Amino acid sequence: MKTPVASLVASLALAAASTSASGFRAAPVADYKADELSFGFSAGTTFVGGEAREHVFHPKGNLADYLEEFPGAPAKDRRHQLSRLDWDMAAAMLGVSGSVRYDRLSLNLGVWYGGSGSDDYDMKDYDWMEGDHVPYSEYSRSDTELTDAWLFDINVSCDLWRSDGFTGYVFAGAREQRWKWTCDGRNDYWYTENGHVWDHNDEHICDYRQVLFFGYVGLGGSWRLTDALSLSAYASWAPGWKGRDRDNHIGAGKIVNDSFDYDANVYAAGVSLDWHVAERATVSFGLDWQKATLNQGDLRQVEFESGEAEAMPDGAGMENEYLAFTIGLDYAF
């Protein structure tokens, strides 16, 4: 998978930095007040860099039929990969979040939206259509733009430990992410038989979207380093994620819809350096990482003209990983 660091560096060129929330999540930014209500608000910009992957597998079935169709595949492998599409995740996103706290409990809610604003990114398509070629039998690269990116996050946190200079807490919540790409112009082809072919056009080839939803639990802490600086960190885990994707193959004349049940995992971690510029205002610099591991689901393909549909149980796969850099302003009142 393309390193999230490389994509993050590319996404930082999309826009000038402005204010943002304390990281790419809904964080407990309201001040602690014993037996009292308090509120916090965050707003700003997040730069995301990473990669999303779309997989197509040979469906499970009769092993003899499978090996007859793909004689080069290992006999032990009944989930031979037919195709994999790697989509660049590079976006500048505006986000707002709020926090309502009573004593040690805090309810946190946030939303982010953005896109890449440019088609200077890649979709790489790898195919293994004739058994197990190393590294592939066919390859193409296309110009791609991440046109829409949404993130919704809600969680409840509870302080377990409070002392001078340190707060430790646990949290549980739910998150939904939506990513949509458009692909215009296919630039490079490579075939086993024909070698490299260069082709450039501005045709609208396909659209792709991923939607993920998951519940998660985690641990976090905040350390007061000096009167002006604090350091915050967290880690979270989701035991399963549910999702769907849709690949509108305009050039090929078909739509592919995939669905995924609660399976695979989501891991996340982050760190934030907070600069207390005033009694109630904080400028924060956050770095967040998230990885949704490979989930296998069902594929349904529909031809545009004939309307003919084909179902492939366990024929689809989806995953993604990103880094997000945030600069922002938090205000507690």
Language-model-detected regions and their locations in the chain:
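Repeated loop/turn-to-beta-strand initiation elements of outer-membrane beta-barrel proteins
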Residues: 104-109, 163-166, 228-231, 275, ...
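Extracellular/periplasm-exposed beta-strand and loop segments of Gram-negative cell-envelope proteins
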Residues: 50-91, 113-151, 177-212, 238-270, ...
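Transmembrane beta-barrel strands of outer-membrane/channel proteins
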Residues: 39-49, 100, 109-115, 158, ...
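Bacterial N-terminal signal peptides
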Residues: 7-16
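Residue-level signature of outer-membrane beta-barrel architecture
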Residues: 98-102, 154-160, 221-223, 227-229, ...
